[in-house]
Amino acid sequence: MSVSVVIPCYNVEDYIDECLDSVKLQGECVDKIFCVDNNSSDNTINVIEKWIENNPDQNITLFKETKPGACAARNKPIDLIQSEWIQFLDADDLLLEDKISLQIKGSHGSDIVYDSFIKRGTDNNEIVIIPNIDVALGIMESNLGNTCSNLWRTVAIKDIGGWDEKQTSSQEYDLLSRLYHQGNSFQRLDNCKTIIRERVSGQISQGNQKLIWENYTNLRVSFFKQVIQKQKDSSVIQKSLTIIFGATQILYKYNPDLAVKIYDTILKPNHFIPPVTTIKSRFYLLTYSILGYRFAERLRTILRKLKST
């Protein structure tokens, strides 16, 4: 079993050494490392070149990708990869010892291995994120592992054309939803062998909140139509509608017309009523039940503005 590691790099001079060291810890299962610099303006390239010089036993190649964004950087070497598996790894994240080998052993013929991970905040506090057992619901609620904690079968990634470089946010769940829709199989593990480190700034893919929430909500609506709506499990459908509703509430702040359109085309036809446990304000629930979503959100926006003044 062989694995290629793909690391997009953008202004990570303080992180990439430790990241590459964590890849080296994986041992012989890694047969190739691809570092892809994505327009770094710091000393990232020099640090990588120095690491290559100091680790002649590692099969590593440094590419440069001028198209901005993590998706373009991750796609750069895909056509060259002949390993059975791909480990995508952000340059500020870490793999703990045996992460990859344990996932290969536990893959059981699946196409995507999704796993728990440690999320380390900027204050160094850590929490463990455990993924959903239900794959479809995990995609809906953004809880199906992480780009770096998961392991991806190369042929599955190539068959769907890799990462969507037009997707400015929600990239990993766009990828996961396409893989699921294509009929690929998923295996859940709970090894927790990846550390995802938060950074205040400097990540490759960042954008404005309006676009982020438009992408997030549209992706879930599309997945609901293609997959969830066809399921017979009413609890999964209800949970998915609740997720879409929560997304529209945030989206309403940035794009009220789109939020209302999604309500009218998805939530209303399914006779959706917000669960009491998801709404803090009884007044909102009362307004919603009597006057509907549009008026309830408009009133909530007015009240929020009054509180902030």
Residue positions per predicted region:
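A conserved acidic beta->alpha catalytic loop
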Residues: S22, D37-N46, K67, D90
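C-terminal subregions of glycosyltransferases and related glycan-biosynthesis enzymes
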Residues: I195-T309
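Acidic helix N-cap motif at the loop->helix transition within catalytic regions
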Residues: D14-D17, D42-W51, L94, D98
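Flexible acidic/His/Gly-enriched loops in nucleotide-sugar-dependent glycosyltransferase catalytic domains
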Residues: D57, K67-A70, I78, K99-A156, ...
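Short aromatic/hydrophobic "clamp" motif used to bind/position activated sugar donors
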Residues: I86
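Conserved nucleotide-sugar donor-binding catalytic segment
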Residues: N132-Y216
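Short, well-formed alpha-helical segments that are part of the catalytic scaffolds
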Residues: V12-L25
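Cell-envelope/extracellular polymer assembly enzymes that use nucleotide-activated donors
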Residues: S2-S4, S22, K32, D174
